[in-house]
Amino acid sequence: MNQEVMNLFNPQAPAQTFDSIRISIASPEKILSWSYGEIKKPETINYRTFKPERDGLFCARIFGPIKDYECLCGKYKRMKYKGIICEKCGVEVTLSRVRRERMGHIELAAPVAHIWFLKSLPSRIGTLLDMTLKDIERVLYFENYIVTEPGLTSLKEHQLLSEEEYMIAVDEFGEDQFTALIGAEAIYELLASMELEKIAADLRVDLAETTSDLKQKKLMKRLKIVENFLESGNRPEWMIMKIVPVIPPDLRPLVPLDGGRFATSDLNDLYRRVINRNNRLKRLIELRAPGIIIRNEKRMLQEAVDALFDNGRRGRVITGANKRPLKSLSDMLKGKQGRFRQNLLGKRVDYSGRSVIVTGPELKLHQCGLPKKMALELFKPFIYARLDAKGYSSTVKQAKKLVEKERPEVWDILDEVIREHPVLLNRAPTLHRLGIQAFEPTLIEGKAIQLHPLVCTAFNADFDGDQMAVHVPLSLEAQLEARVLMMSTNNILHPANGAPIIVPSQDMVLGLYYLSIVAEKEPGEGMIFADMGELQHALENKVVTLHTKIKGRFKTVDAEGNPVSKIYDTTPGRMIMGELLPKNVNVPFDICNQEMTKKNISKMIDHVYRHCGQKETVIFCDRIMQLGFAHACRAGISFGKDDMVIPESKAKIVAETEALTTEYEQQYNDGLITQGEKYNKVVDAWGKATDKITEEMMARLKAVEFDPVTGRQKQMNSVYMMSHSGARGSVNQMRQLGGMRGLMAKPSGEIIETPIISNFKEGLTVNEYFNSTHGARKGLADTALKTANSGYLTRRLVDVAQDAIISEVDCGAEIGLTMQPIVDAGQIVASIGQRVLGRTALDPILHPVTGEVIVEAGRMIEEKDVEIIEKAGIQSIRIRSALTCETRDGVCAKCYGRDLARGTPVNQGEAVGVIAAQSIGEPGTQLTMRTFHLGGTAQVVDSSYLEASYEGTVKLRNRNVVRNSDGNLVVMGRNMAVLILDATGKERAVHRVTYGSRLFVDEGDTVKRGQRIAEWDPYTRPIMTEVEGYIEFEDLVDGLSVSETADESTGITKRVVIDWRSTPRGSDLKPAMVIKDKAGKILKLSKGGDARFLLSVESILSVEPGAHVKAGDVIARLPMESAKTKDITGGLPRVAELFEARRPKDHAIIAEIDGTVRFGRDYKNKRRIIIEPNDDTIEPVEYLIPKGKPFHLQDGDVIEKGEYILDGNPAPHDILAIKGVEALASYLVNEIQEVYRLQGVLINDKHIEVIVRQMLQKVEITESGDTGYIPGDHVDRIELEEINERLIEEGKKPGSGNPVLLGITKASLQTPSFISAASFQETTRVLTEAAVAGKMDTLQGLKENVIVGRLIPAGTGGMTNQIRRIATARDELIIDERRKTSGSAEANAMLVDMTNNAAE
């Protein structure tokens, strides 16, 4: 086979292609067939002659020659003896390269168990033999005998016997009556004698009969492994090795160092150990040594082989000379430094260089400046070729000399070579695909790469010493892809949200903002200009300034392209900017006739891109950048310390707040409020004070002042300009500079009660400085930790989504998701238009008034449609989604919708999974790197009232209100909502109002915008009565279940329920309040239960026993958690928790059915709650709730399916089980978006949907039917559907399953591709499982193909694959044709069909 390595005369056929890779357990015969000879000696090389020892680990006879075409003794040299085997040294004369591919073997004197199959959990050998790992190890490591053939004795099969027991048994029954063996031989015998078919049949019978869950699971595990062996053709006894393969010597090299020492691969040490022990064992057996010695040697051999395969998996780690653990075969594959991730997934490439970057403002967007020195080095081969072609040199050597001397003709040629040859620039960390872009190089002097300022956002680069790498695409295809797909001019939009990413920032924004300012009373106000010439003239002669109010004529074109003009009220600065706008009917002057903040500039660029296309946009961006820089420079904006204005009213506000806090302190001392309430109120008061001061400060900064002498408007405050324009800085930072720093958070996340009153301009006091170090340190520590976390999250996301590729145009799905605007505390955070833009409509979208069709079903919703939808006030739209897409592998283009980075429908072959993963992962890293910018300044996020966001009429859904003693309307319903309807009766806003809120409006009232609708206490949760009567306490015993704190000075007492289970006497109490009538009878509630209110721990009682209460009065309050600061620190782990589908710590309990709440008998420390269904066909459901948990439902409350019985974050699995896939999707999307939204990061919903789709691919079989699966198996959803369709056609019984939600790590490890899973995590476990099952990897995803070195099946690679498939099919047809030669007509027809399809 290896003879034909380099047959020059008939070059070998190109390496055969393959479509799949299979992994299985190697049988001894297989290992022998690979081997070129047995290694008998542990020697490596002769230390005097440096030649390999014969039969040693580097033996040339077995592995091949050391020098090309030269045998070891030197008798045969050179090509002419190719293939001859030297009779003296036995070495074949061939290429030395074969030393990388030829393997050897070691014949073991005693069998040993393969550690992967023994110790990789669950132990395969253990499961097969139905023995525990401990027992097997006892046998393997020669502690116990095992009975293999009990014969007619009373012993049982698989029974373990110690040395003494064995002796007794031999004495009792005689040696030939039974067989008991020890060591790996025993296990080998047991495995070899297994009849797998019979075992499988028995297990199936047992499975059908067993009732216990535990036993069922155990049987299923065993059945699975038995079936794996049967299907894969592996034999169980192959898990015990009699022959160990030895890998080729060049893969475990021995390198001479200077000074006569050698560096060697650890594997050589491990192999040496095995050979030594093996040889010793052979000798001992020949010498007929005592059993105990042989046994010890066998055990040592087993340990040596274990260490070779997986060092440290069992027993102590074997260390080398320097106390460092030796790297075994497993370690070579594992982890970041292992083969998979180090060399297969990421390789270092040639033709690359790196250097520092500097800004290149005079470059065009598609250019980058490349230092001449670098270019010369990178394009060397091209230069050599061109020098030769032009006749400057005749050999490569001459060319080299020319280039080294840097002769003038070399530079000319370099210019030619570089022209139109794009290079790739990359900045680490490459967090999304915009981290690598193509540019055309222009040669520059100096040694730094010049980068265009507008692409810095995409690379997240700045010029404070960042470095970038340059790569040269060599092949024509690579150059083509770089130019067409990766050129910076083709990446104008951000793939995460479709907004422009080539947007001016910092100085450019400041310059454009300055240009667009309007000032009053400037010279020349009211002048009218006909064209730019006049205007320039006036400006140069200082007749007008850039900010004067003038009338100007703006020239553009109409729809036919004829020039038209219109006069606008504007300023000269804006006219200059308007001059740069592309001439297009859809680009009016209005888009730049406004204050140019960063947001508006972004909108303007987006507008130009949508209406004028890419080329115009690129030119426009370049021009606008030049303009921004020029005017930022001319304006000369900078700021000094007096630009930070401290508001005069600061002292007053601080004094007022201090008075308030003293008052709260007093109230607390008087016992009117609890410690927690005081803390909340103080923090609240200071939060409000900080906001007030900030407002005053901003008002001062914004204020327009006039010069008393000239009457002209004074220059705007520079700090305000920078912040307001979005160039640099935020209101938050300005507040810390000129207002007051405000509240700080402790490292634990709690807010410190005393705020920092000073600002940076005044300087902090020592105490304040100390308090603020908390936040600063936490910020720095966070940054370091979170970068790693975020990178890991991205890695898991990419891994789970890598095979989501657009594989067809339309899957024809008839299901989708319902999109609604996201409303938070009455504010619309994401409008319906933003959410449906670029998605495909599932049903026709109709106008609510006229009923005309706005968007037909199956059409993509564009910007123009969104405008109509928003105007019509449509509140919910059904759209197609990747989540509900029915494509077999991948996603279809219709369900995905618009490709955000291009603004057009998505192309086939686009790797949407990876894009989704990058879009979600990238901000994670950036946010975490930005935590400390707030310096830990706390924000209190709590709203305690609700204002109307629209005008309209009020309608109460599920109205349940009463008037309490104070005459206020109080909400008594658990799921009540306030709706605001417009004149046509359309819903304009929906607000959930919580139980216990005070309502200021009632059904049918009209409200104005901004009017208060309701308010509530954000810090406590009330328990209210709905009947009138007299209070009586039950089981509220002082000191046991209630503690009473009295205040000496006022005598006011406050009762708080304490944990009554902590004392033995109190364990049976059920603290509650009941309401009785005058006669002392317990009143009934409207639902029929008694008016008894059970109290949970920490409830504060608001009434005395015997007090008279009315409906709607609060009888007790439950304090809520105190306000913690919200910051992405909570955010990143939260995102990971959602994607990993973990159960949150105190998760909510969700009602599974509609019904009425009843309290059952309590356990010791759990409360039993029963929901009695409204529907008699359903069984009642019970829940157990820990007694200490704050619990707000009362006996007799009506509850709907999906409502929370116990508050908290719901577990996603529960949502999936109770409310279904759509509810789960919307929950995950909204929760994840919430985290990013807090940080102001925009991510399109579809990215999150793609990831959730990958998490929902499996179903758990509940009814197996005739599918051949076992209940509890995880199967692909689409696979099950296909099998069921087939079974129904054949009239058999289909199987059914429930969708399961897998976390991203779990889902990655469950991919059908074992190569992908092994390169992700837990390499040994994945490979062991795959080998036992004899898995086949069909190379469908991206990762597998990268690893085996093929084009990925996405993008251009996808097309190549498709073409190749068609070609092979056609080739096969043609070959068949030739065989038949009859040339049947139908085959011809098929051929024509296929050719046509291919052409299409």
UniProtKB/Swiss-Prot annotation:
Domain of life: Bacteria
Cofactor(s) the protein needs: Mg(2+); Zn(2+)
Protein residues bound to Zn(2+) 1: C71, C73, C86, C89
HAMAP family noted in UniProt: RNApol_bact_RpoC
Catalyses which reaction(s): RNA(n) + a ribonucleoside 5'-triphosphate = RNA(n+1) + diphosphate
Protein name stated in the entry: DNA-directed RNA polymerase subunit beta'
GO biological processes: DNA-templated transcription
Functional summary from the UniProt entry: DNA-dependent RNA polymerase catalyzes the transcription of DNA into RNA using the four ribonucleoside triphosphates as substrates.
SMART domains given in the database record: RPOLA_N (SM00663)
Organism: Brucella suis (strain ATCC 23445 / NCTC 10510)
